[in-house]
């Protein structure tokens, strides 16, 4: 749990720092530096011999997370023709969905059969492959919209980016208020066995992949705002259905799939909305979105846990989850 917290702290700390002090470099060089930090962080974690090294490894690994997706979205907005940017960002975000579907089960297998060190060593090696791909295939472009340090904050005078930050935070909090307790929810309320959880996690991982792809497809027909609002509505309804029909296995699986699909269907449209409403401070805006996303995860898990602390059964975590998602909508 502490290692997860160190990673999350790295995300929150690193995103704005990288956004503010990277305007003098090209976007390609920023991406290369961020991936190098990933390699270093995972290498430190892999070969650590003390708790301090473990903590430093996770902190360094989390540091580039938020900025990487922010810079990546800006690069795509500059090289993809208008009207296709949301779909392109959805393609970038699909990396996270594939990680949930394939990477986590495979990493768990390596940890159980060999050692957790092999999992993080593989991640470091994969980061090197990403580094190579960026070096050869990403064009060397600059974000000419970046002004002085003070000018990068000007977009925050408008309420629009704050509303998008709030929507990102509450939307993620809503899903994670329930998803953080998916195992006991499925086992103790829906009646699944512990051995079924691998299948269930792969199913919701597939939902994340398909939700992200669907969002990208719809971006050619609808605005990012409309996609985000409708997706939040679908998440609210699916969370309410999870509360009322949690005792039925088929219903639980169906609405869990829909809920997780909705979570990643939100990612690309919200990222594009931030870029559209953060003129002059796109890097800072995108980084702020990642902070809101991670803060939402923590708030959601706390809200779900509060219901359990008050003595309610596991399916009651879906109620604050639905309320948080409704706030996002």
Where are the regions that the model predicts?
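Helix-to-loop junctions at the C-terminal end of transmembrane segments
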Residues: 15-26, 211-224, 308-309
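Helix-breaking motifs and short loop linkers at transmembrane-helix boundaries and internal kinks
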Residues: 26, 47-53, 191, 245-246
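Helix-loop-helix hairpin linking two adjacent transmembrane segments in secondary transporters
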Residues: 53, 82-83, 87-136, 181, ...
